[in-house]
Amino acid sequence: MGLALEKVCFLGVIFLISACTVKKEGVKNLSYKHESLRAYENAKDYDPTTKKAAYKRNFFERHFKRYSDSQDSNTKDQPLDNGMRDSSSIQRATMRPYQVGGKWYYPTKVDLGEKFDGVASWYGPNFHAKKTSNGEIYNMYAHTAAHKTLPMNTVVKVINVDNNLSTIVRINDRGPFVSDRIIDLSNAAARDIDMVKKGTASVRLIVLGFGGVISTQYEQSFNASSSKILHKEFKVGESEKSVSGGKFSLQMGAFRNQIGAQTLADKLQAENPNYSVKVAFKDDLYKVLVQGFQSEEEARDFMKKYNQNAVLTRE
């Protein structure tokens, strides 16, 4: 009898220990989809229908701990354009070079209509109601996004190239810090292009405007194709043609032959699409100029890679 009782007690203890273990299902598979340093933890187990983390709670959570919805203190009922920070001082601060994981990133010049291709990911509940890189409060129900180098408040159209669905977002954060990702979308934007479940999507970005405003040249297409919610968040107006990305430039070479200068310029432009490369004729020479550096340090990093004897000038 005593031995049988000991057996029952032992099995009971084993059951309690196993019951107390949190079971996060599918983490390995989903972690691949959300490798962004910023987005991975909150996106992997997110269920957009309940707006809660969809994991099995352990024994103590089920019986003694009440689930908290405090992360939804910032909700879709609030104004979605609430808190846009567009002062010139904040804009300048967020255009400075910064370092993440030992790698330097250089916010840079961008032109209206410029296009970028790459992979998008998304981030949601665990960052909801927390501060973004420019000091705004992140609202996952709003159409915003994180980008490593685009100027803050740049407005871009995001097209899912696999299904041709599109949305519009305003850049208000930095990331994703994964080499093959070019943009981290809010949950609302990710749902627009049907990529929440998959986690990532191949996308094309088109710059529509700056300062949170869509340029008038895109007004017709915006009115024709955009949803009501996007019309509440974005307005059409006069927008700059470009946002300057720097005050330094490099003269990478000077040629008597225009063909030689153009060959170098084409090579540098192809390898560095975020900079402006041009050939200027001056003093009987064709000079190859690279523009758009945010700082002297950034320009000197470029020199180390291509030409230590390049001439550094302030624009």
From Swiss-Prot:
Basic and acidic residues bias (residue ranges): 68-79
Stated family: Belongs to the RlpA family.
Its biological purpose: Lytic transglycosylase with a strong preference for naked glycan strands that lack stem peptides.
Source superkingdom: Bacteria
Stretches for region Disordered: 68-92
Name of the molecule in the record: Endolytic peptidoglycan transglycosylase RlpA
InterPro entries per the UniProt record, alphabetical: RlpA, RlpA-like_DPBB, RlpA-like_sf, RplA, SPOR-like_dom, SPOR-like_sf
Lipidation (S-diacylglycerol cysteine): C20
GO biological process, one term: cell wall organization
Entry membrane topology: Lipid-anchor
Lipid tethering residues (N-palmitoyl cysteine): C20
Gene for this chain: rlpA
Documented EC number(s): 4.2.2.-
CDD domains from the UniProt entry: DPBB_RlpA-like (cd22268)
Swiss-Prot/TrEMBL keywords: Cell membrane, Cell wall biogenesis/degradation, Lipoprotein, Lyase, Membrane, Palmitate, Signal
Signal peptide (from-to): 1-19
